[in-house]
UniProtKB/Swiss-Prot annotation:
Protein name: ATP synthase gamma chain
Alphabetized GO MF terms: ATP binding; proton-transporting ATP synthase activity, rotational mechanism
Localization (cell): Cell inner membrane
NCBIfam families: ATPsyn_F1gamma, PRK13425.1
Family the entry assigns: Belongs to the ATPase gamma chain family.
InterPro entries: ATP_synth_F1_ATPase_gsu, ATP_synth_F1_gsu, ATP_synth_F1_gsu_CS
CDD domains to which the protein is assigned, alphabetical: F1-ATPase_gamma (cd12151)
Pfam families: ATP-synt (PF00231)
Gene Ontology, cellular component aspect: plasma membrane; proton-transporting ATP synthase complex
PROSITE patterns: ATPASE_GAMMA
Matching PANTHER family: ATP SYNTHASE GAMMA CHAIN (PTHR11693), ATP SYNTHASE SUBUNIT GAMMA, MITOCHONDRIAL (PTHR11693:SF22)
Subunit structure: F-type ATPases have 2 components, CF(1) - the catalytic core - and CF(0) - the membrane proton channel. CF(1) has five subunits: alpha(3), beta(3), gamma(1), delta(1), epsilon(1). CF(0) has three main subunits: a, b and c.
C-alpha cells in the first residue's frame, strides 16, 4: 500500500502535468483559430481556379497539355505525404501514415518493389517514419510547419509537375488530413496529377471570348492551380493538426482531473487510517499503563 508521502508525490506530479496539458490546450485553441481562418480563406480561391480550369479545358484539346491528360499505364508514382512536425495530437499522424502505407504498399506495391515509387514528406513525423524504414524519399521538409510558407507548397508542386512532364512518374498522389470539424478530420489520398477529369468538368454553360487563347491561359493557369492545391492541402492539414492537439490535450486534462480525484480519495483514506492507527496505539498504551 502506498504511503502518504508516495501519494503526495503522485498528486504533485499529476497536478504539474495537468497544468502543462491545460496550457497546451489553450495554445492549440489559439493556433486552431488562425489555422482554420487560413484554410477556410484558401478554399474559395482553390475552388474557383479548378472551375476556371475546367471551363477552359472543355474548349481545347487536353492532349496539348500533358498535365491534363492521363497515361494508359502507370510506370512510376510520387506520393506526397503531409504530417505534423510534433506529436501530442492523438492519432493524427498515426492514422494518416497508415493511409500512406496502404497507398505505397498496396495500390503501388509493385512500383515500390521495383524502385519506381518516390515520396515527398512535408512534416517531421512522416519524414522520420518512412526514412527509417528505407523508403525512397525524394525530398523531405521536416519542421515545415514551424514557419508555414507558400514557397514550400510551390516548390513541392513544381517538383511534382517537373517529374510528371519528364515522364519520371505517371501519377502523383497527396495524402493528408482535411479539416472538416474539430472532432472529425477526413483522411484523404487525392490525385494531384494528372489533373482529374472531374476537375475538368467546370461550367460549360457560358460562352466567353478569351484573350489570349484558352490554350495560352491554361498554360498559365495549370501551375497556379497545382501551387494552390498543394498550399490548400497544407493549410487543411495544419488546421486539422491543431484541432487534434486541442482535443488530445483536453482529454488529457480531464483524465488528469479524474486521476487527481482518485488520488485525493486515496490520500484521505490513508491519512484517516494513519490517524486511526495512532489513536489505537495511544489508547492501547494508556490501557497498559492503567493495568
Amino acid at each position: 500500500m502506498p504511503t502518504l508521502k508516495d501519494i503526495r508525490v503522485r498528486i504533485k506530479g499529476v497536478t504539474s502535468t495537468q497544468q502543462v496539458t491545460k496550457a497546451m490546450k489553450m495554445v492549440a485553441a489559439a493556433k486552431l483559430r488562425r489555422a482554420q481562418e487560413r484554410a477556410v480563406m484558401a478554399r474559395p480561391y482553390a475552388a474557383k481556379l479548378s472551375e476556371m480550369l475546367g471551363s477552359l479545358s472543355a474548349k481545347v484539346d487536353t492532349s496539348e497539355n500533358p498535365l491534363l491528360s492521363g497515361r494508359s499505364e502507370v510506370r512510376g508514382a510520387l506520393v506526397i505525404l503531409i504530417t505534423s512536425d510534433r506529436g501530442l495530437c492523438g492519432g493524427f499522424n498515426t492514422n494518416i501514415i497508415k493511409v500512406a502505407q496502404r497507398v505505397v504498399n498496396n495500390e503501388y506495391g509493385e512500383l515500390n518493389a521495383a524502385g519506381r515509387l518516390s515520396m515527398i514528406c512535408a512534416g517531421t513525423r512522416g519524414f522520420d517514419f518512412f526514412r527509417k524504414r528505407g523508403y525512397t524519399i525524394l525530398k523531405g521538409y521536416p519542421s515545415v510547419f514551424q514557419n508555414l510558407d507558400f514557397s514550400t507548397a510551390q516548390e513541392i508542386a513544381e517538383t511534382a509537375s517537373s517529374m510528371y512532364l519528364k515522364g519520371e512518374v505517371d501519377k502523383v498522389v497527396v495524402v493528408y488530413n482535411e479539416f472538416k470539424s474539430v472532432l472529425a478530420p477526413v483522411l484523404k489520398a487525392e490525385t494531384l496529377l494528372p489533373i482529374s477529369s472531374e476537375e475538368n468538368e467546370g461550367d460549360r454553360g457560358g460562352d466567353y471570348i478569351y484573350e489570349p487563347s484558352p490554350s495560352a491561359i491554361i498554360s498559365e493557369l495549370v501551375p497556379k492551380h497545382l501551387n494552390t492545391q498543394v498550399w490548400r492541402m497544407m493549410l487543411e492539414s495544419n488546421a486539422a493538426e491543431q484541432a487534434a492537439r486541442m482535443t488530445a490535450m483536453d482529454s488529457a486534462t480531464e483524465n488528469a482531473k479524474e486521476l487527481l480525484r482518485t488520488l485525493n480519495i486515496s490520500y484521505n483514506r490513508a491519512r484517516q487510517a494513519a490517524i486511526t492507527k495512532e489513536l489505537s496505539e495511544i489508547v492501547g498504551g494508556a490501557d497498559a499503563l492503567q493495568n
